A protein has these predicted regions:
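Asp-based, Mg2+/Mn2+-dependent phosphohydrolase catalytic module
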Residues: 1-5, 113, 117-218
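N-terminal helical cap/lid subdomain that shapes the substrate entry/recognition surface
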Residues: 2-89, 93, 100
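A generic structural signal for short
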Residues: 43, 82-83, 105, 136-137, ...
């Protein structure tokens, strides 16, 4: 039996390997068409998204307008329809085992419902019990704790019955805001600044998917 009744999973670079395979390449293609002088490296892209989210990076580091941010998201939606990120090895087994034991699987992500739905169907053959995605709007997306509060309300759960799993600080901030345990998806990390922060602040830090699996069912 698993330690928790509900997993609340980030999507990009937690369940699927997306930054290097989809999100950054889409960003490069779009920014080279609009502001080639503002191109940043993959490492800087990841650091900026960690520190202030994708939208914050676009506003504060790249100085894009709101229209340009929205256009960039639409560009990404088209790009990702034909560029599908692979799931991390082992996640299929973890999620199937968790569901078989009666566990709930929810997603809180800055990705879109369309892509989360497709990725779960293709990689795992089922849909999450609840999804909280880009379409919520900025006011209710991570790091706002709306998703966790709504999950607890809908499924009559206490904070300690959930586990938030994310590679980014906004998931950590959301979990902390409502007392939900937080596990860091360290298997996607290579930046020492990100690793140091998440090791120091997360309830649990896992360097590999297999270590997360051992903890969850241990």
């Amino acid at each position: 039996m698993a330690r928790y009744r509900c997993l609340v999973l980030d999507h990009d670079d937690t369940v699927v390997r997306s930054a290097e395979t989809v999100n950054y390449p889409a960003f490069v293609e779009n920014i080279m068409q609009t502001h080639p002088d503002r191109l940043i490296s993959l490492a800087e892209f990841n650091r900026q998204c960690f520190e202030q989210s994708y939208t914050g990076m676009c506003r504060n580091a790249l100085h894009l307008t709101e229209d340009e941010i929205n256009d960039g998201f639409e560009f990404w939606k088209v790009y990702v329809r034909t560029h599908i990120p692979p799931a991390y090895d082992g996640f299929d087994r973890i999620l199937r085992r968790f569901r078989a034991g009666g566990g709930l699987i929810c997603v809180s992500s800055h990705s879109s419902v369309e892509n989360i739905t497709r990725d779960y169907e293709r990689n795992f053959g089922f849909q999450p019990d609840a999804m909280y995605a880009w379409e919520l709007g900025e006011a209710l997306r991570k790091p706002d704790p709306y998703a966790l509060h709504d999950i607890m309300r809908r499924f009559s759960l206490r904070p300690e019955e959930l586990l938030m799993v994310d590679d980014m600080k906004n998931g950590y901030d959301m979990a902390r805001a409502c007392g939900v345990p937080f596990a860091c998806a360290g298997w996607s990390h290579s930046d020492p600044v990100i690793i140091d922060f998440m090791r120091k602040n997360s309830d649990f830090y896992f360097e590999s998917v297999s270590a997360f699996e051992d903890f969850l069912f241990g």
